[in-house]
Amino acid sequence: MKLAVIAGDGIGTEVTAEALKVLHALRDDVETTDYDLGARRYLRNGELLTDEDLDSLREHDAILLGAIGDPRTVPAGVLERGLLLPLRFKLDHAVNLRPSKLYPGSSSPLANPGDIDFVVVREGTEGLYCGNGGTLRAGTDYEVASEVSQNTYYGVERVVRDAFERAQSRRKKLTWVHKTNVLVNAGSLWQRAIETVGQEYPEVQVDYNHIDAATIYMVTKPQEYDVIVTDNLFGDILTDLAGAVTGGIGLAASGNIDPSRKNPSMFEPVHGSAPDIAGQGIADPCAAILSVALMLRHLGDDANAERIEAAVLAEAGSRDGGPVKTAEVGDRVVANLK
């Protein structure tokens, strides 16, 4: 396996080291290439993501990302627009995959959370995030600002199909989330894609939630969700809420998937670079480790993915609430591999 590693900034380097420790404990065929991308490189020479970087990344089977950013030194939006979004768009990462599971040892803010285990499939390259908009008469009383949500049938259909495939292999329940009573044009396109693709998956039960209703149900009855599919903006909101109800983002892994598999998909923990605790060795690496499991499953190595998930489950369940070092967590997960 050829793996591109973007450790990034802050605690990204620390959690990535533990994720690689676990990966190398399972497989001896992994060839890694480190990429200096993120705030440090930007501050050093002003570079964000070059064509040469992209060409080199495309030569790999997958990308493992730690965390990007340093809000103390880089203005908001610079790295997002210049690095993270171009990676997503130019590598055609149409599917943003976010598993949400309440692990033993994790504390949900919900009084009676039940058994929470669902996946959010978020469209990743269209909607309001595609950069279609602008400003007229800026700084005047007549200023006009617009953001256009761009949806294509091709883009929606492939994400919907991915979600149906995942539902078929899980509990066979798919919930699509939108705001069709207000966003009638995009909503109609999404509904037709759901109905058309759904004919190929007769065993999958399909439900619909308005986005505002979904935020209520995710708090009041999250255990009823299996696979959720939604657009870019709504997915961004729901996945953060999903992280909260499952005990925080310390265990939240994610994948940015090219469904065509023409480009390497990218896997990363959801948390940020947390520069305030960087270097202290107290960051929880489990989200990065679970991102490796997500990556292996994507690449067809289900057996080792399951071993990692079971090892993290055992480690999380053994915690007593006391402090634990980043490297110690990685060592415990390796020791739990069976």
From Swiss-Prot:
Q: What is its main location?
A: cytoplasm
Q: Where is Mg(2+) bound in this sequence?
A: 212, 236, 240
GO biological processes: L-leucine biosynthetic process
Pathway given for this chain reads: Amino-acid biosynthesis; L-leucine biosynthesis; L-leucine from 3-methyl-2-oxobutanoate: step 3/4
Q: Which SMART domains match?
A: Iso_dh
How the cofactor binds, per note?
Binds 1 Mg(2+) or Mn(2+) ion per subunit.
> What Pfam families does the entry give?
Iso_dh
Cell location: Cytoplasm
**Record's keyword annotation contains Amino-acid biosynthesis:** yes
The molecular function terms in GO held by this entry are: 3-isopropylmalate dehydrogenase activity; magnesium ion binding; NAD binding
Q: Which residues are noted in the entry as NAD(+)-binding?
A: 272-284
Task: List the GO terms this entry assigns under cellular component, sorted alphabetically.
Answer: cytoplasm
| EC supergroup of this enzyme | oxidoreductase
Q: Where does substrate bind?
A: 88, 98, 122, 212
Alphabetized, the UniProt keywords read: Amino-acid biosynthesis, Branched-chain amino acid biosynthesis, Cytoplasm, Leucine biosynthesis, Magnesium, Manganese, Metal-binding, NAD, Oxidoreductase
Q: Does the keyword Cytoplasm apply?
A: yes
Q: At which residues is there a site annotated Important for catalysis?
A: 129, 179
Q: Which cofactor does it need?
A: Mg(2+); Mn(2+)
Q: How does it assemble?
A: Homodimer.
> According to its UniProt record, which protein family does this protein belong to?
Belongs to the isocitrate and isopropylmalate dehydrogenases family. LeuB type 2 subfamily.
Recorded hits in PANTHER family, A to Z, give: D-MALATE DEHYDROGENASE [DECARBOXYLATING]
Q: What is this protein's function per UniProt?
A: Catalyzes the oxidation of 3-carboxy-2-hydroxy-4-methylpentanoate (3-isopropylmalate) to 3-carboxy-4-methyl-2-oxopentanoate. The product decarboxylates to 4-methyl-2 oxopentanoate.
Q: What is this protein called?
A: 3-isopropylmalate dehydrogenase
Source organism per entry reads Corynebacterium jeikeium (strain K411)
